[in-house]
Amino acid sequence: MIERWTTAVLDTDLPGGWAVARGPDGFLYDDNGALFPRHWLKGQDLPLLAEHGIGHLDGEPVYLLELSARAEVPGCGWKGLRAFMLEGDHTLYKVLGYAAQIGTWAREHRYCGSCGRPMAQVPGERAMYCQPCDLRSYPRISPSMIVLITRGDEILLARSPRFVTGVYSTLAGFAEPGESAEDCLIREVREEVSIEVRNIQYVGSQCWPFPHSMMLGFHAEYAGGEIIPQEDEIEDAQWFSVHALPPLPASRSIARYLIDLYVARRLGHAEPVLPG
């Protein structure tokens, strides 16, 4: 199968192509979506911070215009990345997710973290460079584990105070230096709900551009202990029957995939497809 979207480092001095614009309120869009003819978009009165060539969509080059402030464009509005995730065009979401990660990284690395001098984009490479320090900075990716813990026909789900009201999800957490993904899983489960797990199985991964996580999905079986929610992190955690689940995360998330996959296998239903 031919991929419609492929990432690439493109020369911003070349003409043509499509462009997306990102500002403090998300991405610019109109009735046709978030992709605009690049020459038209660059002709608007936009507070341009930087431009990045990010890849090809259906063979056409795509660029990101990173803005320093909100701008008003006739016939257009602004929409956050999560809203695009929930809509039907998954390819567009992948384009915008990558654009958001590159834009955030470049914005946060305009100055050298060692000497404080301005950094420059490296031609032909996705890197920012400080010549006095001979320091290259590459896009940040933060490895995180996410795990569905099961006990027969029951699954353990939890609520963070930051979740939408009523929604429960799987446990997750960032890996620390020196940890494997499995080490991270065991530690996070102990910290968040005070139980032990066994038979840890890797399921799949998902890029999660909020802002730069790589979610490593696992399934694990309950091994022992009583649920004690971590103060300030877990509002509630409990076992739910696969026949009576609470409101769940968005269908595009790997958290939802882990849940749906286990439920499908327990009930003999068709297995879902892992979101890209």
Swiss-Prot record:
Name listed for the protein in its UniProt record: NAD-capped RNA hydrolase NudC
EC number, UniProt record: 3.6.1.-, 3.6.1.22
Binding site for a divalent metal cation 2: 188
Residues annotated as binding a divalent metal cation 3: 188, 192, 233
Biological function: mRNA decapping enzyme that specifically removes the nicotinamide adenine dinucleotide (NAD) cap from a subset of mRNAs by hydrolyzing the diphosphate linkage to produce nicotinamide mononucleotide (NMN) and 5' monophosphate mRNA. The NAD-cap is present at the 5'-end of some mRNAs and stabilizes RNA against 5'-processing. Has preference for mRNAs with a 5'-end purine. Catalyzes the hydrolysis of a broad range of dinucleotide pyrophosphates.
Source organism: Pseudomonas fluorescens (strain ATCC BAA-477 / NRRL B-23932 / Pf-5)
Residues involved in Zn(2+) binding: 112, 115, 130, 133
Annotated binding of a divalent metal cation 1, by residue: 172, 192, 233
Pfam family, one: NUDIX-like
Nudix hydrolase domain segment(s): 139-262
Assembly with partners or alone: Homodimer.
Cofactor mode of binding and number, as noted: Divalent metal cations. Mg(2+) or Mn(2+).
Single GO MF annotation: manganese ion binding
Biological process annotations from GO: NAD catabolic process; NADH metabolic process; NADP catabolic process
SUPFAM superfamilies: Nudix (SSF55811)
Catalytic activity: a 5'-end NAD(+)-phospho-ribonucleoside in mRNA + H2O = a 5'-end phospho-adenosine-phospho-ribonucleoside in mRNA + beta-nicotinamide D-ribonucleotide + 2 H(+); NAD(+) + H2O = beta-nicotinamide D-ribonucleotide + AMP + 2 H(+); NADH + H2O = reduced beta-nicotinamide D-ribonucleotide + AMP + 2 H(+)
Family per record: Belongs to the Nudix hydrolase family. NudC subfamily.
The organism's place on the tree of life at top rank: Bacteria
Keyword annotations from UniProtKB, A to Z: Hydrolase, Magnesium, Manganese, Metal-binding, NAD, Zinc
